[in-house]
Amino acid sequence: MSLLTPDSGLLFWMVIVFGIVFVILAKYGFPVITRMVDERKQYIDKSLLAAREANEQLANIKADSEMILAKAHEEQARILNEAVATRERILKEAKTQAQVEGQKLLDEAKKQIQAEKDSAISDIRRQVAVLSVDIAEKVLRKNLDDEKEQMEMIDRLLDELTVSKD
């Protein structure tokens, strides 16, 4: 039981050694330990402050990015609307121009057809006139021998002329 109840000499030396160790620690160890704890506390405080600032910057950056995205979406919508309007305008202009060109071609074709028709009619009239003169000449040679036949022919031609004019 000597370990559980130490002698007074042992107790004296233990107190002395403890006191010396305590004084040495108090003079050299505790200031270093408290300084390190204070430095660690300052480092943690600085880190917390930096983290808080980083979170604020992140929130600001996030708000800025959302604002930029909103502007980009607005710009995209504006550009798309302009593109649609431009496309519609171009299509309308092209359609109008195509109608104008089509009408122009149609008018030219009508003029050309009318000119060809007039040319064909005048050509046919000329041919009919030539044929009529040839036929009349042959008929007249044959029929003009008799005066009675001449009068009948003149009457018939006059009747045909009045009927064709009506």
Curated annotation (Swiss-Prot):
It comes from the Bacteria. It is found in: Cell inner membrane. Gene3D superfamilies: F1F0 ATP synthase subunit B, membrane domain. One of its GO terms (cellular component) is plasma membrane. It comes from Phocaeicola vulgatus (strain ATCC 8482 / DSM 1447 / JCM 5826 / CCUG 4940 / NBRC 14291 / NCTC 11154). It holds the Pfam family ATP-synt_B. GO terms for molecular function: proton-transporting ATP synthase activity, rotational mechanism; proton-transporting ATPase activity, rotational mechanism. F-type ATPases have 2 components, F(1) - the catalytic core - and F(0) - the membrane proton channel. F(1) has five subunits: alpha(3), beta(3), gamma(1), delta(1), epsilon(1). F(0) has three main subunits: a(1), b(2) and c(10-14). The alpha and beta chains form an alternating ring which encloses part of the gamma chain. F(1) is attached to F(0) by a central stalk formed by the gamma and epsilon chains, while a peripheral stalk is formed by the delta and b chains. It is a single-pass membrane protein. Belongs to the ATPase B chain family. InterPro entries: ATP_synth_B-like_membr_sf, ATP_synth_b/b'su_bac/chlpt, ATP_synth_F0_bsu_bac, ATP_synthase_B_chain. This is ATP synthase subunit b. The gene is atpF. Keywords: ATP synthesis, Cell inner membrane, Cell membrane, CF(0), Hydrogen ion transport, Ion transport, Membrane, Transmembrane, Transmembrane helix, Transport. The chain crosses the membrane at residues 10-30. The keyword Lyase does not apply. F(1)F(0) ATP synthase produces ATP from ADP in the presence of a proton or sodium gradient. F-type ATPases consist of two structural domains, F(1) containing the extramembraneous catalytic core and F(0) containing the membrane proton channel, linked together by a central stalk and a peripheral stalk. During catalysis, ATP synthesis in the catalytic domain of F(1) is coupled via a rotary mechanism of the central stalk subunits to proton translocation. Component of the F(0) channel, it forms part of the peripheral stalk, linking F(1) to F(0). Signal peptide: none annotated.
